């Protein structure tokens, strides 16, 4: 860990840990929504998200402690704006349709994935194998979670739009099938050649 300033790494880990906790809080608030209870796939997904983000948050906290990092006043200020945005999501959780909550989860998980991509690069630059392992595992898990949300999202949209449960199920499954095609390997560009 000689190439990168330890304080910078610690601040970055603390920043990501705070973001992870805010997203986890939003997920926990969503679980209280009566509307969520109407879609069993959403209930199962929120349980999965809560478990995964709880574990990730604990590992990030341990990494922050290892770097003797505490959330600074400056960082708290920066996070306050974002936390305010998330608080809006949380406050709306009880009245928002499930599809909107799933969309917000998709966005939040994507932001966490970007943060863990940055953390992986930081850990590589710092030659910190433990942090590389944490970031890599979290990123892989977040990719799976985003994919799971992408399956529940179209189903929740269709169920909110159609009154006929059989028709909603049929079209919902078709929507999942059609939208999941975008996640096929041929739609992902090969890694750029590094010269």
PLM regions with names:
Residues 4-37, 99-126:
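Alpha-helical bundle segments that constitute or directly flank the non-heme di-iron/ferroxidase center
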Residues 9-13, 35-41, 45-46, 59, ...:
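Soluble, non-transmembrane catalytic domains of enzymes that act on hydrophobic metabolites at membranes
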Residues 14, 40-48, 77, 103, ...:
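Short, charged, amphipathic alpha-helical segments
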Residues 15-22, 48, 52-55, 59, ...:
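Charged, amphipathic alpha-helical oligomerization/scaffolding segments
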Residues 23-26, 105-191:
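Preference for long, well-ordered alpha-helical segments
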Residues 39-79:
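Conserved alpha-helical segments that form or flank metal/cofactor-binding pockets of metalloenzymes
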Residues 62-103, 165-175:
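Carboxylate-rich helix-loop segments that flank metal/cofactor sites and access channels
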Residues 194-195:
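Long, non-catalytic architectural segments outside compact domain cores
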């Amino acid at each position: 860990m000689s190439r990168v300033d330890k304080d910078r790494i610690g601040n970055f880990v603390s920043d990501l840990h705070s973001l992870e906790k805010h997203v986890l809080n939003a997920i926990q608030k969503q679980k209280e929504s009566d509307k969520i209870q109407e879609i069993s796939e959403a209930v199962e997904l929120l349980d999965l998200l809560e478990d995964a983000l709880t574990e990730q948050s604990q590992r990030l906290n341990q990494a922050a402690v290892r770097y003797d990092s505490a959330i600074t006043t400056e960082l708290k200020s920066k996070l306050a704006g974002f936390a305010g945005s998330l608080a809006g999501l949380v406050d709306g959780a009880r009245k928002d349709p499930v599809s909107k909550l799933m969309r917000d989860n998709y966005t939040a998980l994507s932001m966490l994935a970007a943060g863990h991509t940055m953390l992986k690069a930081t850990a590589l630059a710092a030659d910190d194998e433990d942090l590389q392992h944490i970031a890599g595992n979290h990123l892989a898990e977040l990719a799976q979670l985003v994919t799971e949300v992408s399956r529940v999202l179209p189903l929740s949209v269709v169920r909110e739009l159609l009154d006929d449960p059989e028709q909603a199920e049929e079209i919902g499954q078709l929507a999942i099938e059609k939208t999941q095609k975008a996640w096929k390997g041929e739609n992902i560009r090969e890694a750029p050649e590094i010269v």
